[in-house]
From Swiss-Prot:
EC code(s) of this entry: 2.7.9.5
Residue range covered by the transit peptide: 1-56
GO CC entries: chloroplast
Record-linked SUPFAM superfamilies: Glutathione synthetase ATP-binding domain-like, Starch-binding domain-like
Similarity annotation: Belongs to the PEP-utilizing enzyme family.
GO molecular function: ATP binding; carbohydrate kinase activity; metal ion binding; phosphoglucan, water dikinase activity; starch binding
Catalytic site: H776
Protein name (Swiss-Prot/TrEMBL): Phosphoglucan, water dikinase, chloroplastic
Amino acid sequence: MTSLRPLETSLSIGGRPRRGLVLPPPGVGAGVLLRRGAMALPGRRGFACRGRSAASAAERTKEKKRRDSSKQPLVHLQVCLEHQVKFGEHVGIIGSTKELGSWEEQVELEWTTNGWVCQLKLPGETLVEFKFVIFLVGGKDKIWEDGNNRVVELPKDGKFDIVCHWNRTEEPLELLGTPKFELVGEAEKNTGEDASASVTFAPEKVQDISVVENGDPAPEAESSKFGGQWQGSKTVFMRSNEHLNKEADRMWDTTGLDGIALKLVEGDKASRNWWRKLEVVRGILSESFDDQSRLGALVYSAIYLKWIYTGQISCFEDGGHHRPNKHAEISRQIFRELEMMYYGKTTSAKDVLVIRKIHPFLPSFKSEFTASVPLTRIRDIAHRNDIPHDLKQEIKHTIQNKLHRNAGPEDLIATEVMLARITKTPGEYSETFVEQFTIFYSELKDFFNAGSLFEQLESIKESLNESGLEVLSSFVETKRSLDQVDHAEDLDKNDTIQILMTTLQSLSSLRSVLMKGLESGLRNDAPDNAIAMRQKWRLCEISLEDYSFVLLSRFINTLEALGGSASLAKDVARNTTLWDTTLDALVIGINQVSFSGWKTDECIAIGNEILSWKQKGLSESEGCEDGKYIWSLRLKATLDRARRLTEEYSEALLSIFPEKVMVIGKALGIPDNSVRTYTEAEIRAGIVFQVSKLCTVLQKAIREVLGSTGWDVLVPGVAHGTLMRVERILPGSLPSSVKEPVVLIVDKADGDEEVKAAGDNIVGVILLQELPHLSHLGVRARQENVVFVTCEYDDTVTDVYLLEGKYIRLEASSINVNLSIVSEKNDNAVSTEPNSTGNPFQQKLQNEFSLPSDIEMPLQMSKQKSKSGVNGSFAALELSEASVESAGAKAAACRTLSVLASLSNKVYSDQGVPAAFRVPSGAVIPFGSMEDALKKSGSLESFTSLLEKIETAKVENGEVDSLALELQAIISHLSPPEETIIFLKRIFPQDVRLIVRSSANVEDLAGMSAAGLYDSIPNVSLMDPCAFGAAVGKVWASLYTRRAILSRRAAGVYQRDATMAVLVQEILQPDLSFVLHTVCPADHDPKVVQAEVAPGLGETLASGTRGTPWRLSCNKFDGKVATLAFSNFSEEMVVHNSGPANGEVIRLTVDYSKKPLSVDTTFRKQFGQRLAAIGQYLEQKFGSAQDVEGCLVGKDIFIVQSRPQP
């Protein structure tokens, strides 16, 4: 799956180092990346530490250990490994001290644009041995570095950093006395945790908010937000106008470019300085776009601006003279365009996601920066008489002149370096000079919008009302309490958890205030000062999102220190306090995602559910199950939904960025490393990443509580075959050279797949997403005797990946799934419950329904009373006239259901539960109608010719696809005659909404259900004959989709034998829809019916919609109902009579905290018992196990379809 789950798994098992001895996997490459600008700055002092032999190192280590470790001072060490790994792989450090896992467990490093980074607190005057490893989260295996252990001798105390390269274990380790890399993300917050890892906080790093005694923020000279991200050229101070044409080496490659990408690259080539590059972006964003082009323009702009701000695209002087007010004016125009898009009616969640990534890279346009001569303080500083002449010249030529002629991000970097230089030795320079330069630095950060969170919040204080100021003050106060925790020793982890929670809550409150102020959008007539303040508000709320990333990461680290998932699972029975706190943290994290515009309704629903389940606690029991079981099962559904939200976010980024990053990166000459790691850095830099990590901890704990193995079995059985991985089950997804049996690992499914159509040699499927058991895909797999299981748990999936390419045995039962490598290939590749019916066309269709005489008699009477169509023709039939011969098995079954429904009011189960149900009114457009329409349109000859060709057409060369499209094009334009519409109007009320459904002669048969193979079109009306006719044409045309053609070919059915009738029924507006199997599909227990239930229309169940339904197991004979799963589909499909009858449905976000089936045990039990009674009744009347579809409308159960259960 394209998600936060690891994608690459070709890891071998490495050995454990024992004093320099390692067992690396053979052939492990060591692709080393060289980061630009990685050299230490001038004047940096450090000392080199040579690699030593592990034997001598061990002796010195023993001597060190004899000292009293409790009195040893600490060394703060930041480690950076410059190495590229595959997406999904992680890097860890493991070593000889307890802080490094004592060679047992690695400490995870976190990805940044500068490499893999972690911050450690280690005892001073200690000899440390260590190595780096590569691993997958949840996996047990590691790839170790080659060579001897690395050895470093730490000084007594201090703060240092070291830079390492994979497999270069003999390289000298230089301890630099000041951090080479600015701490990013949680690294700057985790100094209080032993061996805690930093987390990417890539473009938006957050500085601490200092506070003074009265609780107000206190300004200080903090470094800029993107200084530590700088990957441009090293600052060179000039004492004269020595600007050279440094851009001469740049290369632009416009090969293959067109549209927006070409315009951007050509614009960059013609624009040397920053304001001209900003103008290129403004020109692109101000154009009129359709929805897709707008997203492309935003993505290219976001990538381009980020590379400018990080120095990977350099800015130079071009001989012109434009003060920073030029940049500010352009920025205001860009900001206005972005804000108009942000709240546009057609703006998508993806658009908003990218817009938010552009904002931090725009300069400020406050009035002081749009003035004719802005940022004049540096001019006064450059002409001071109390500083040396050479220093004055360097400031004048490197900063002042450059800034006032062609300002760019490099000016802020130069100013940072100069400030560090003049403050390095107190008293070396005039105090007033240092003070003025520090103030100028703050002004420059303000211009570049690169200030810390505190500085940004300070800038909006004047615009907050009284209540807003109170919320801000509360946040600052809680932040001060958290700062005190950072300096406290031996503080209880539970206390730390509570303080972090309080800070998260106050942060969320403050961000809520800002979002409410922004949600009204930008007025067209807004004055310039209001727009400038709006920019500050926007940047503040973005920075608060960034800081929530830091806090949530610290929360997770502290939770792990308390025992993580194991502690949570252990505490369920006796105390849910830690659960409550952790769930509150998750809700806050999801709220931050909502504030950022990503699937807001979904975030709100998930938050409501978590809070509701938390409030319910363990009080609710069901049957013999205690409250812990129902609580866990319900919470599992919502946690899976929350995890799905994060995966969809990462999938969105993967669909948005990689291709465009590659295109524009190549064209602009960006280093390959930056291109390859761009998207992963974006995924790991967002709050969604931390929400995903917290979900993982909670999911693991819930699995332990439930005793879940992570597998879900749709079709039990045993299969032997080579394990292969494909993205989807599609014809052509397997190489034609593969003839032996295969078991597929499948990333995604949409419910439209035919397993055997992708290959007759497919004997088993492992799907990496949740899927309803009784979905169309599940039914087809069962009918095709394909062992089918699903799994979404990362650790289990990781283990499965390791078997790829091996010949394996997949054994799936109702209680467990086993995967194992087998040495000898088994001739019996698959063993499931076989179908006894064989080829459906070897049977007589009229024997499909054998009904008792008490039902046959009412049917015969109904036939005698009705008349067929208009003037005796068969333009349409009443449902009571439908037969297998005239309208197919589905329509005939609906006719039978209408009779059974009239008798069901008198039927009760042994427990006295009524088996009563209703059916919707209906009619049928019979077999032959499509052919008649072809004759009238003059297309019958073309249709017949294409049908003959498709019998022998090949799949591999696309011939089937081409012919299928031609057939559909001919048929989809057909519509039933006017007399059919007139007849149907006599049956249905004038304003009723209808659904037109397929009823082919090749579906709903024992041995060939063809579930979901053909189309149904909901929400049409006879009031609009054209729309109704078009819907009928689509149903007819679905007889010749590629999938339908290949499905019939796989079943040995000639295409000319297939024909289609159309079942027209009143569409219902259900609260719940269900699929019911009257014999348990997992273990074939005839005493148990199993139902899967979804909110709204039943298409959610039939398709491959991601999510799980309510799953109920109901005993026919004793009335016991067991809940096997709670629903977590994100959306329900509904039809409103007040809306247009256009063949479309409305999708609404579901909040299960408001659904009776989730919150009411009694309702769930009664509903399950009614389904069991109805299922048993239908099974008895039809004489075999049934696959039943129906719904609940108010208090009435409707049955819309019943077919033989595969």
